[in-house]
Every structure is written in structure tokens, then in C-alpha cells.
Amino acid sequence: MANMIDKIDLKSQGSSNLSGEMTNHQKVGTLYKRLLLQVKHLWHFLLLAAIGSIFFSAADASMIYLINPILNYGFGPGGGITKQSATILMLMGVGMVGLLALRSVGSFVSQYFIGSLGQKVVYKFRKDIYKRLMGLPASFFDKHSTGQIISRLLYNVDQVTEATSTAIITVVQDGTFVIGLIVVMFVSSWQLSLFLIVVGPFLGLFISIINKKFRNLSRNTQSSMGNVTHTAEETIRNYKEIRIFGAQQKQQNKFFKNLDYTYSQQIRTIALDALTSPVIQIIASLVLAFSLFTIAIFGTNEGDGSSWLTAGSFASFFAAAAAILKPIKNLTKVNVVIQKAVAATEDIFYILDYPAEKETGSKELAKVDGNVTIKDLSFAFGEHKVLSGVSVDIKAGQTVAFVGKSGSGKTTLTSIISRFYTQHEGEILLDGVDTRELTLENLRSHLSIVSQNVHLFDDTVYNNIAFGLSREVSEEEVIDALKRANAYEFVQELSDGINTNIGNNGSKLSGGQRQRISIARALLKNAPVLIFDEATSALDNESERVVQQALESLTKSCTTIVIAHRLSTVENADKIVVMDGGMVVESGKHQELLEQGGLYTRLYQSGLQ
């Protein structure tokens, strides 16, 4: 049997798995125990569902046992009905009505409360995971694809819900039914029941082998589903690039490859699931057949010809023995659900246990002038050194442009200023205070960011501009920010003005319009330090001119750190910092650097883009 199971291939495809970094996987029992602890506050739902299941199963088992007294006492000699047996039959009828009523009540109670428990588990886990994602460091999102993370939030939680609802109720309900049927079998014939116990260890061995196979298959399926989600999300997000570069077939092949692997894993799970029940049924049928031979041979005592097995006990025993196959089958099937849930639980707890963004500071600055000092800053991604000994002094109100070739460390530097990453050496001071000594919330409250790749939300213009502000923002404030960002003119022309939904990531707007909405958002926040990753190289001349005017309006009232790509930006900057290979190689004003004839001169002559 083990060889048959081993033929179901369990090879993994080396796909990305969020829990792949866990060197020692927690044991199934520990994971399941922790899973139940997550919903311990819902114990009353589980208790009521369990009580309902017990009533349901006890009523079912009792009705099977009624076969015994009905056959033994409900009929007179020769199979006829006597006055006494008629009374017994009527009592049995009343008893069956009562048992059916108990069964119905138990069914409703168990299904209602276990369904409620399942929905509460979905709600709790998705809420906890989403809340956790809000506090995870940038390194987490660098390591894991969007599709993988979304798959964990949606698909994995559904798998866990099955374990805490369907699986639990099946274990309790069918487990109770099995116990009840075993009691019926022992009461009907303890001799035959003892014989059936022999099969227990064989079933246990078979199920333990199946458990391991299911767990491996489930883990592979969880991972491959994440890859499918990621590829689909990537395709939808980048549909323009895919079509322009004629990569439809390549992207389709990538998606189909991941889908094929997921399909193969699911088919293997189905095959293993389909194999489990027939094997158990074959074992059980062989035992029942052997029992019949035993009864035929040893069913009577040699002395007086009396039997240790009456017609009623025989019928109730075999009715119970036949009925026990279905709950046993259900209990073996629930193993599939549990193993899927265990694999899903690993990834969910991986996210929930992932170290949050480090909060190293406790200080808070109520007001900031905007002086930024960078001293001997060094940083590396693993073995790859990105910044080395960077020192820059930025006075309040200055506009400092960072220029350099791609990969010179400009964007990484701004990420460290925002503390999305923490430097390995050196320090960054904000008004003389090390940024690591400030709370993350306080530090970031003094910063505004306008990204090269503008990020807008599928919401109204108003909500995008007032995004993140804890105070109430009036329409007048939003309109003022739009005017200063040279955006109010086109917003007025939208169907609902500032209350117009702009689509996914501002898809209903042009590139220049999206830039200006982003600038208006920074204007409304009015932070003393602005980080601007310039992207005007992607705009037409008119849009560039309007965005430049909006940027000038924004930089008048704050310290501005610009990752510059345009000549007009560097020409007007108070200071230019030239970076190469993660180091500052030149620093000064535009004309001074041109006269030096170094890297800046070459970048300037090439247009800086």
C-alpha cells in the first residue's frame, strides 16, 4: 500500500514560498494547537457546535440500536405481532420521533454555530494579517511578490477556515457517531466487536502514511497558488507593456506553467484522496465478511444449541458496522482539509511572526525647521554595498539635487532618510537629532514624498489629496492645494470635480495630471522636508512645464531633496550632490561643477536622464 502511495509524485517545483525561510517546520500538532488558540475567545461557539454534534450523532446511533429491541421484542413467536409486542412497537415509534427531533435540533445548532465560527475566523485572520502587513519592514515586500502575499491573505485563510469549521465539526460529529456505533456494537455483541478491534492498528498505520503525503502535497499547492496569483497580478498591472513589447505569449506561457504545476498538485491530491476511502472500505468489508464466517462456524453453543447472538443483536451489530464506514470515511477525508490547513497555517503564522519594522526611537519633535545632516552613511543589501561614507549637509529651505548614474545609491539614500531601511554605519540628523532616536510616526510626519512612480488610490480626487491626514480636511483646503499644484483646472473638468473617482492608481488621468495630484497631496501635508523622485522625463513639454511650476510652489516652503533627471532642476538647485558607486564624488553649485569638468559635466552634457 505504501508503494502505491509513493507512486503519487510529490516533487516540488522550487516555487517561492513565504514560509520557505523556516528551517525547522513546526510540528502539525503545535501548529494546530496554535491555530485553535487564535480562536479561543470563540470557545462558546465551538462548545455549542460540539454539543449539537453530539446530540446529532447520539440520536443517529440510538436509532440504529433500536433495531435490536424491535426485532427481539417487537414481534411474537413466528414473526407475528402480539398485544405485548404491539405496545413495544408503539413505544419504539415514540422513541424514534423523539430521537429524530433531537437529531434535528442538534443538526441546526452544530451547523449554525460552526458556520458562525468559520466566518469569525476568516474575519479575524484577514484583519490580523492586513494589520500586520501595515507594520512590516520594506525588506519583507522586497523578498515576496505581491501575488504571494495576496494569496496568503485570501486563499490560505480560506484553507484555515476549513480546518477550524468543517474539520472540527466533522471530527466531533463523526467522531461521536463512531464512538456511539462502537458502543452499539459492543452492546449487541462484544465478541464480534473485540474481533473488529484487530483492524484498528492497520487503519492507523495507513492513515499516518497518508497524512505525510497530504501535508507535502498541500504545501506545494499553497506555494504554487501564490505563483499563479502573482503572475496574474503582474499581467493585469503591466498589460500595456506586455502588449507593446509583444510579450503576450511569453507571459501566457509563464502563467500556464504555474497553472499546470498547481493543477498537477491538485490532481495528485484528488488521486490520494480517492485512494484513501476505497482502501479503508476494502479493509472494513474483509473484516465484516470474516465476521460472518465466524458467526456461521461458532454462532451456536455445542451444549444446548442456544446462540450468543440473537436476530436483533445480529441486525443492530451489522447495521452499526455498516453505518460506521461512512463516518470513518469522513474522518479520513477531513485529514485532507487538516493537512491543507496546516500547510496554509505555516505561511499565515510566518507573516504574523515576521519581525515588524524596528521602532528604535522614543523622541518626538513637535516642530521641525528642516535641517538634514548626513554623516558617513554606509549601507549594503547583503554582500552588495550600496552606499559608502556618504556625507551631505542640507540647510533648512534648501533644494538639494542628487544626480548620478542608475544604481549609484540615490533612491536607497532617500529610503534610509525615511527609515524604510536602517543604515549600517553613520547617522542622519534632522534638526540635530538622530532620526533613529525619533519614533517612526513622528519622523515620517515631517516628511513628504513624491515618487517617480506615482501611487494613487482607487478613490476620489479629494480622498487622494487628503490621504493619511488624521484631521478633518475641508474642500477649500483641497482646492487650494490643487491650485498651487496647477491641477485645479483639469479637476474642475472632471465629471464630479474633486469628488470624481480617478480609477485604479489614477488610471483615468494622464501622467502629468497624476504627478500634479501627487504634488497637491504633498502640498496639503505641508511637511518641512520633501523627498522628490523626479519623473518629468516621461512627460511632454507642456506637462513638464506645468509640473515644474507646481514643484516650485511646493519647494518654496520646505527643504527639498530631489533625485534629479532634468536639466532645469539641477540648474535651479541650491546644491548638487553627484553620486557614483554609492559615494559622493562631487558637490557644489551648477556652475562650479561645470567648471570642474568631472562626472557632473559629462552627465549634464548627456542631458542627465
Curated annotation (Swiss-Prot):
Family annotation (Gene3D superfamilies): ABC transporter type 1, transmembrane domain, P-loop containing nucleotide triphosphate hydrolases
Binding sites annotated in the UniProt record for ATP: 404-411
Organism of origin: Francisella tularensis subsp. holarctica (strain LVS)
Family the entry assigns: Belongs to the ABC transporter superfamily. Lipid exporter (TC 3.A.1.106) family.
Reactions this protein catalyses: ATP + H2O + lipid A-core oligosaccharideSide 1 = ADP + phosphate + lipid A-core oligosaccharideSide 2
The protein's name in its UniProt record: ATP-dependent lipid A-core flippase
SUPFAM superfamilies associated with the record: ABC transporter transmembrane region, P-loop containing nucleoside triphosphate hydrolases
Top-level taxon of the source organism: Bacteria
Keywords: ATP-binding, Cell inner membrane, Cell membrane, Lipid transport, Membrane, Nucleotide-binding, Translocase, Transmembrane, Transmembrane helix, Transport
Biological role: Involved in lipopolysaccharide (LPS) biosynthesis. Translocates lipid A-core from the inner to the outer leaflet of the inner membrane. Transmembrane domains (TMD) form a pore in the inner membrane and the ATP-binding domain (NBD) is responsible for energy generation.
Listed PROSITE patterns: ABC_TM1F (PS50929), ABC_TRANSPORTER_1 (PS00211), ABC_TRANSPORTER_2 (PS50893), MSBA (PS51239)
Record localization: Cell inner membrane
GO CC annotations, alphabetized: plasma membrane
Taxon lineage: Bacteria, Pseudomonadati, Pseudomonadota, Gammaproteobacteria, Thiotrichales
Record comment regarding domains: In MsbA the ATP-binding domain (NBD) and the transmembrane domain (TMD) are fused.
Membrane topology, record value: Multi-pass membrane protein
Residue ranges occupied by any ABC transporter domain in the UniProt entry: 372-606
Ranges annotated as spanning the membrane: 47-67, 88-108, 167-187, 190-210, 279-299, 305-325
Top-tier EC class: translocase
GO terms assigned for molecular function: ABC-type transporter activity; ATP binding; ATP hydrolysis activity; ATPase-coupled lipid transmembrane transporter activity
Enzyme Commission designation: 7.5.2.6
InterPro entries registered for this protein in UniProt: AAA+_ATPase, ABC1_TM_dom, ABC1_TM_sf, ABC_transporter-like_ATP-bd, ABC_transporter-like_CS, ABC_transpr_lipidA, P-loop_NTPase, Type_1_exporter
Every ABC transmembrane type-1 domain range: 47-340
